A protein has these predicted regions:
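Basic nucleic-acid-binding interfaces
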Residues: 1-88
Length: 88
């Protein structure tokens, strides 16, 4: 995982929640950690990793705060800790 992806993963867990996360960058990050990403016919992204799944809006360029919260919970449920697994 390159430095840009690590910074993005750490930003996901920062406080306050970031509102400028680019959807394409997040898709690339999730691909790096081994998640599978499928586009549904309803304009959503279905992300699956280690038996966990989350659905995000795919139509917007940046993720909404709700999507960021769902994504953060998904990453935590998958057992990924950015401080431990991917230090900057």
């Amino acid at each position: 995982m390159n430095h840009r992806h690590r910074k993005l993963l750490h930003a996901l867990f920062s406080h306050p929640l970031p509102t400028n996360l680019d959807r394409h960058d997040v898709e690339t990050l999730l691909g790096e950690i081994g998640a599978t990403i499928d586009r549904t016919s309803h304009g959503r992204l279905m992300i699956k990793h280690e038996g966990h799944s989350v659905s995000l809006h795919a139509s917007e360029r940046e993720l909404s705060k709700d999507d960021v919260v769902h994504l953060k919970k998904f990453v935590e449920a998958c057992g990924i800790n950015p401080e431990r697994d991917f230090p900057i």
